[in-house]
Amino acid sequence: MSIIKEFKEFAVKGNVMDLAVGVIIGGAFSKIVDSVVKDLIMPVIGVLTGGLDFSNKFVLLGTIPPSFKGNPDSFKDLQAAGVAAFGYGSFITVAINFVILAFIIFLMVKFINKLRKPEEAAPAATPEDVVLLREIRDSLKQR
């Protein structure tokens, strides 16, 4: 079998195509969740915490060089200048993104599982002793 033929068989199998569709939809869906967190949830949390902006929460680990021209209270400016800073606010935002995304995926899987019809279990195999007893019975009937 040629490599191209093997690749075609591999690429068109149901699982590979399902995975490709899932990755594409997941990428688009993560942008929606990111926007929900950044544009809807974090501003509400900011209002509830007195205007706290999580994106600029950081701990300075190094010194700011004298040639630094940006805002020393801006995590992005410090990062761009190569100043060592621990950006825990950005991590909090990403963690909230993850929790929301995981919860939505959980709900989707739960919903899909409800829609699926439960597969009927195959009848249990007849025990060997019962089969043997039936054979003996049938043999006795024939005499």
From Swiss-Prot:
Keyword RNA-binding on entry: no
Cell compartment(s), UniProt: Cell inner membrane
Keyword Secreted: no
Main location: membrane
Residues that span the membrane, as ranges: 10-30, 89-109
GO molecular function, one term: mechanosensitive monoatomic ion channel activity
Membrane-topology descriptor: Multi-pass membrane protein
Pfam families, alphabetized: MscL
PROSITE patterns in the cross-refs: MSCL
Protein purpose: Channel that opens in response to stretch forces in the membrane lipid bilayer. May participate in the regulation of osmotic pressure changes within the cell.
Subunit structure: Homopentamer.
Listed HAMAP family: MscL
Name of protein: Large-conductance mechanosensitive channel
Source species: Burkholderia cenocepacia (strain HI2424)
Gene (UniProt): mscL
